[in-house]
């Protein structure tokens, strides 16, 4: 259960009383500091938030206050560093441009998705000694840096040893999703460059911050269909076979196995919706087939959380 909220300024606050009550009820406590998605209007971060500001210590005073609230609770707590940064509408990842305030669209249109993030001059630069590769998507390298910063801040500096860190809920996409995304771009865009950038941004290997900074690999897996009536811009329905969903999951798990073979996997979000419908015979069929396959055929998956909006 969530035990923290955000005030009008986008600062996190932890409800110790509510967390203790949830603990007594046998619930797992989940918290987040700032969502590492620097989009305008993001409600789970201060106005104008960027990963670069986070790494420069701009928010340290508020994070220290938040750490104090967590310390009052002091029991095992699941810490997420962001939500589904590569999901549908992942229009920022961790930010692009020299200061990390630009969008993925900006990076594609201006052909500036690489080599503009250099963490070597930041405080605690040793955390990022292998980050800043010119051939890797800047937005995903900022996510990696943010994960390391959060871990170092809360675990090492603040001593909150009871926190267990996930990996932001990396979204499972259809195998051909990048091709669809590139095809939807306007003709004025260099689509060869766009595909190169998208492939780099959506690589789990590029994103993974390293075993030292992650306790759980968290994935978001929805066996969702896309109906034109629900999704702006769609001109036809896309009903995706169950086998295609599992082919996409298998592809991501192969990436996970390559870079994090010893880490348990957790579905931070998991659902079987029929488009946006929460109950239909097709959704029920997906639940029956999908859930049994997950439980019987994927021993590396140690748990899941059903997402309330998409059961």
Model-derived features: where do they sit?
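Hydrophobic faces of well-ordered beta-strands that scaffold small-molecule active sites
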Residues: 1, 27-33, 77-81, 162-164, ...
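Acidic-and-aromatic substrate-binding clefts and catalytic sites of carbohydrate-active enzymes
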Residues: 2-17, 37-40, 52-61, 169-179, ...
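Cell-envelope and extracellular/periplasmic
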Residues: 3-6, 83-84, 95-121, 129-136, ...
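Substrate-binding cleft of extracellular glycoside hydrolase catalytic domains
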Residues: 9-166, 170, 188-191, 198
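Alpha-helical scaffolding within the catalytic cores
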Residues: 10-20, 61-66, 174-209, 243-257, ...
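Glycoside hydrolase catalytic-domain groove-lining segments
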Residues: 13-34, 212-277
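Substrate-binding cleft of secreted/luminal carbohydrate-active enzymes
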Residues: 77, 263-311
């Amino acid at each position: 259960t969530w035990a923290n909220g955000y005030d009008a300024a986008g600062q996190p606050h932890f409800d110790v009383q509510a967390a203790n009550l949830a603990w007594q009820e046998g619930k797992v406590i989940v918290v987040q500091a700032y969502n590492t998605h620097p989009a305008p209007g993001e409600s789970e971060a201060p106005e104008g938030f960027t990963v670069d500001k986070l790494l420069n210590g701009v928010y340290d005073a508020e994070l220290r206050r938040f750490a104090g609230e967590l310390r009052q609770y002091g029991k095992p707590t699941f810490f997420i560093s962001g939500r589904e940064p590569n999901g549908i509408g992942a229009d920022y990842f961790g930010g692009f441009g020299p200061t990390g305030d630009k969008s993925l669209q900006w990076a594609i249109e201006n052909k500036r998705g690489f080599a503009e993030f250099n963490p070597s001059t930041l405080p605690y630069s040793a955390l990022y000694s292998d980050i800043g590769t010119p051939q890797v998507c800047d937005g995903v390298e900022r996510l990696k840096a943010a994960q390391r910063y959060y871990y170092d801040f809360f675990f090492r500096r603040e001593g909150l040893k009871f926190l267990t860190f996930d990996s932001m809920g990396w979204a499972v996409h259809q195998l051909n999703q990048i091709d669809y995304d590139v095809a939807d771009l306007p003709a004025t865009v260099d689509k060869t460059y766009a595909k190169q950038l998208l492939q780099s941004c959506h690589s789990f290997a590029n994103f993974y911050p390293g075993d030292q900074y992650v306790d759980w690999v968290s994935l978001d897996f929805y066996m969702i269909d896309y109906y034109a009536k629900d999704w702006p811009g769609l001109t036809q329905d896309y009903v995706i076979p169950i086998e295609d969903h599992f082919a996409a999951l298998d592809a991501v798990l192969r990436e996970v196995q390559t870079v994090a073979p010893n880490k348990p996997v957790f579905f931070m979000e998991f659902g079987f919706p029929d488009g946006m419908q929460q109950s239909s015979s097709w959704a029920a069929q997906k639940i029956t087939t999908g859930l049994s396959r997950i439980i019987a055929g994927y021993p590396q998956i140690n748990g899941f959380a059903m997402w309330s909006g998409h059961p």
